[in-house]
């Protein structure tokens, strides 16, 4: 499947709710460990969220994560108008330990 970057900006009053949903995805990924996926989410100072997913497996293992389904429900309504999820295929040009496993994660 490759690398995908998704960018969106929730409404200010829904950003913490969105973060809670994202954290639940990571908690379930940690307990299920579906393999074939590397995934990171960043929250920028302006409230924008950026998700970076490197999916090796086909089909996408995130489709089997219940918390991911809950996160996706209502995502457009949580976002500012015109700031909904914008997924784009991406190519990693360079990385210094970013996609490597870390004992501090």
Where are these regions (language model features)?
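Active-site-flanking beta-strand signature of metal-NTP-handling nucleotidyl enzymes
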Residues: 2-9, 50
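An amphipathic, aromatic/His-enriched active-site/gating alpha helix that lines ligand/cofactor pockets
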Residues: 24, 28-38, 54-89
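Flexible, glycine-rich phosphate/dinucleotide-binding loops
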Residues: 48, 58, 96
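Short, surface-exposed ligand-recognition loops at beta-strand->loop->(often short) alpha-helix junctions
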Residues: 9-20
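A short beta-turn/loop motif at secondary-structure boundaries
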Residues: 41-46
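Catalytic "initiation/cleavage/transfer" segments centered on a nucleophilic residue
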Residues: 80-105
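Polar/charged side chains located within well-ordered beta-strands of beta-rich proteins
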Residues: 18, 39, 51-53
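Non-catalytic surface loops within mature trypsin-like serine protease
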Residues: 10-12, 55-57, 94
């Amino acid at each position: 499947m490759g690398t995908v970057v998704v960018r969106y900006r929730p409404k200010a009053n829904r950003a913490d709710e969105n973060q809670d949903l994202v954290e639940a995805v990571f908690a379930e990924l940690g307990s299920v460990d579906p393999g074939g996926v590397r995934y990171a989410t960043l929250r920028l100072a302006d409230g924008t969220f950026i998700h970076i997913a490197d999916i090796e497996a086909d089909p996408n293992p995130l489709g089997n994560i219940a918390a991911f389904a809950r996160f996706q429900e209502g995502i457009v309504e949580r976002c500012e108008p015109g700031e909904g999820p914008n997924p784009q295929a991406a190519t990693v040009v360079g990385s210094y330990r970013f996609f490597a496993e870390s004992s501090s994660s």
